Amino acid sequence: VGFIDLATKYNLYVTVKPGPYVMAETTDQGIPRWLTLTYPETLARDDRGQMWGPEFVGLNNSIFKEKAARWLDLFAKKVVVPRQNLKQGAVIMMQICNEIGIFQWLGAKGDYSASNLKAWQEYLQKAFPELAQLARLLDRELKSYEEVAPPSEFCETRRQFVLYRLWHDFHRQVYADYVGFITDILRKAGVKTPLFTNNCGWVYGRAHEFALNGTFHRKTDKAQPDLLFGLDHIPEIVSPNNTHDGFVANQVARELQHRTGPLYSAELQCGSREHGVQPYPNELGLFYRHCIIHGLTGMNFYMFAQGKNPKGRGVDGPMFYWYNAVNYKAEHQPAFPMIQTLGQWLKFNGSFLTEAQRPAHLGVGFYPHLYETEFLVPILGKGTKLNPSKLGLNLDPVGFRDRAYFDGVIRILMKKSVPFDLADLTTRSLRELLSYQTLVVLSNEMMDAKTQAHLAEFVRAGGKLVIFPTLPTYDLDFNPCTILADSLGIKTTGRGASNRIYMDNLKDIPVPQLPQIISHRGAKVIARDADGQVAGVEKKIGKGSVRFFGFFVNYSIEEHPDLWSAMMQLPGIPRNAVADNDDLSIEARYVNNEGLLFAGNFHRMPMRSNLSVKNPRGKEMIRVGLVELPAQTGLMLPIQKQVSGDTTIVFAHAELMKVQSDAKGLHLGLQGIEGMKGQLVLKTRRPIREVKVDAAAVPFTKEGDTWRISYQQNGRVQTVSVT
């Protein structure tokens, strides 16, 4: 409370995280030790009855919920409600617990405590009102629901797989009920501020597991439509290998919120919890800008300031975080100037960003059920319980989604700066899917009947579907289900003997598995293997079309991006910005006839590209010209920015920090990169007589109805005065 009042004194907005779990590297995760010592029945337990640890509680335990309710009610009434309507220093948001489901994910185990097993039985009864339904599904005789114990063994039979599916689904219901429990307490206590929870999933600088964590709230988002799903961004080491990871995290949270409300990073890396794992200012500034151009509109640094823990309170010792913007003595550290600059830029451009859109004509299907594997395949795959071959599956779901989906399709699209959205196939309407010029779906052998029918209808209604490497043959309960294949009229006849693909001008391209051989009756052949067997077809279905390939591609050789491009016909997908090579990552956002162009260099050496960007005020692309960026730097360039009644910045090779005008003329604050040649192109009806940069005259030329100004940039905010 003292901290909140101090923030109020200095007119700083406050978000609060009262728990029950607060984590933040505190001892016992913020759960009071007296709770589990006095009431051991509150502890979460594994399948052998052993407690997970003294700080891990069962979310369904009535005693835990009673104590948590009293605490949250008290905190809400005493701290939040009196401060939520203040004119300055208000509490503006409140976090619901912290990274719900993280301990189940990290431990690869569900909660087998008595309270949770009771909830499990209730879940089964609600899901299967007739016991016979459940018995048929599990292919066994049942006399009561109590006979169905949660799974813990290796998954080698289809019955075991179905039981694990139910166990995963049950925990998602637990998380939804838990969020609802906390939300009800806070709202009844009078809290009116927005509520949010946060999703984790970055491991060693990769976000492969973020989508899995996002599925924890597959049921929460339906029960709590106003809840914000904050996301954690912990890239650690920024490089071309994880350029796409932040985008995926943004998109998963965006889909959970059904593309409404602000996209908010509740934990945006600024510093490191591990001494020796040092993020550097330039790479973080690049990462922040990349996340912003891809939709991030709310940022909470974790952590902006270093802290010193009271004795015994820090699980990692006396110091809390390293390499922050300021240390625990409030002294500026190397990251401070970068964040200060970004803050100044956001202050000027923030209103644009909250309204701007990133047009996308390509959708990439996101199928959440593919990610519901946390109890079968532990993080990093250590000690997996899943044996796909014994289940009759050709594709390991985790390896498939990581290699083909995440580091295959998504990485290639990001590398080529193709604007696209992740589209949740289980929640997007037919109309929403049809808004995309092309929908790309990576499918394994399992997909529920409703989604299969949805995709079939998408094609018949005029959609263009690109799908690979197989068509589903089972539903999620391992019942035969070929609705999509039957609707598309596509049949496969086994696997070929060569893994080399020939398509268009691409020859002898290796793929990870032997491709499926496809019957091409009534279809156009578009890909073959080295033996001439058909591995890809295209055909018309109703008003739409489908391209099916019996293979997928990794990204390990130079030709793989070109093969992906040919499969998805990427040259025909409209771009918001284009470059003459893939060395820079580029993207743009637009609103009210104005735009913002991001150019970023994720490499560890200088890179250059000739850039053009879609003109928000006309059909012709705007030629931005050659942009060369030092290693791991990025810029947000203004496009068609109205800066006065009769003057527009067509483009600049610097970030626009401020605009002022007086009797002497127009004054633009521009900040570029030290040593980079400055280019500013203005369009104005008035003749320009003189241009000065920081009071020194610089050359300019008239080109048609525009004026081009050239100068040298010094890495600081430079005032360009135009009279």
Regions from the language model: what does each represent?
Residues 1, 22-33, 200-209, 418-436, ...:
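Aromatic-lined carbohydrate-binding/catalytic grooves of carbohydrate-active enzymes
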Residues 1-39, 183, 187, 446:
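Aromatic-lined substrate-binding rim segments of carbohydrate-active enzymes
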Residues 14-18, 92-96, 195-197, 229-231, ...:
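Hydrophobic faces of well-ordered beta-strands that scaffold small-molecule active sites
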Residues 19-23, 96-101, 200-205, 234-236, ...:
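Active-site beta-loop-alpha junctions enriched in small/polar residues
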Residues 36-219, 426:
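Polysaccharide-binding and catalytic clefts of secreted carbohydrate-active enzymes
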Residues 68-69, 76, 89-92, 145, ...:
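Carbohydrate-binding surfaces of carbohydrate-active enzymes
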Residues 185, 189-245, 275-288:
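Extracellular glycoside hydrolase catalytic/binding regions
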Residues 673-675, 681-723:
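Beta-strand-rich ligand-recognition modules
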